[in-house]
Swiss-Prot record:
Record-given protein name: Dephospho-CoA kinase
Keywords attached to this entry: ATP-binding, Coenzyme A biosynthesis, Cytoplasm, Kinase, Nucleotide-binding, Transferase
GO CC annotation, single: cytoplasm
Subcellular location: Cytoplasm
Annotated ATP binding sites: G12, S13, G14, K15, S16, A17
Main location: cytoplasm
Function, as annotated: Catalyzes the phosphorylation of the 3'-hydroxyl group of dephosphocoenzyme A to form coenzyme A.
Organism this protein belongs to: Idiomarina loihiensis (strain ATCC BAA-735 / DSM 15497 / L2-TR)
Length: 202
């Protein structure tokens, strides 16, 4: 059985920087955000269902999903959002499980902003939370995405609170300092996870 480490953290916490360091160590990273884009690529059953349900004006000239238009369509309509989630969540889950089965590194990172909210942690042996104070989350996200403060705060509210996330963590990676500090922590965790995979196989 593949040893899976679930990585999560609030918006702006630096999940991508952390998982990139694991990748440099030869570890397979399955990113739920990337999977969510893969399941709606041209030719997929999900994209066909979305076009039938919402109309073809949600497709670009190239036949790709206009994600911004879709977000606007479902943002203020809970029923449509539920319909979309009931279509996408099972497809994303299935694709994640397929990629987990195909992974060949000693252990696998499953990175998902909503790992805990969407119960993806049930596929993981460990949960690693990338953590920064909420003020820093806000500051980093506004700088990175050039988003209005209110929009970032709304996203943060929709996610688990920092306190609730930390309660569910097996491991915590503090990311309020430098990239060197992040790298050191990743290296330590990497050794721990390698040891855990060996123990699991014995």
């Amino acid at each position: 059985m593949t040893y899976v480490v679930g990585v999560t953290g609030g918006i702006g916490s630096g999940k991508s920087a952390a998982t990139a360091e694991f990748e440099k160590l030869g570890i397979t990273v399955i990113d739920a955000d990337i999977v969510s884009r893969q399941v709606v690529m041209p030719g997929t059953p999900c994209l066909r269902a979305i076009a039938e349900h919402f109309g073809r004006d949600l497709l670009t000239d190239k036949g790709e999903l206009d994600r911004k238009a879709l977000r606007q369509k479902v943002f203020s309509d809970p029923a449509e959002k539920d319909w979309l989630n009931s279509l996408l969540h099972p497809a994303i889950r299935e694709e994640i499980l397929t990629q987990l089965e195909q992974a060949s590194s000693p252990y696998v990172i499953l990175s998902a902003p909503l790992l805990l909210e969407n119960n993806l942690d049930k596929y993981c042996q460990r949960v690693l939370v990338v953590d920064v104070p909420e003020e820093l989350q806000l500051q980093r996200t506004i700088q990175r995405d050039e988003s209005p403060k209110e929009e970032v705060e709304a996203i943060m509210k929709a996610q688990l609170s920092r306190k609730a996330r930390l309660r569910k963590a097996d491991d915590i990676l503090n990311n309020e300092s430098s990239i060197d500090q992040l790298r050191r922590q990743v290296n330590q965790l990497h050794q721990r996870y390698l040891a855990a995979t060996v123990a699991q196989e014995e």
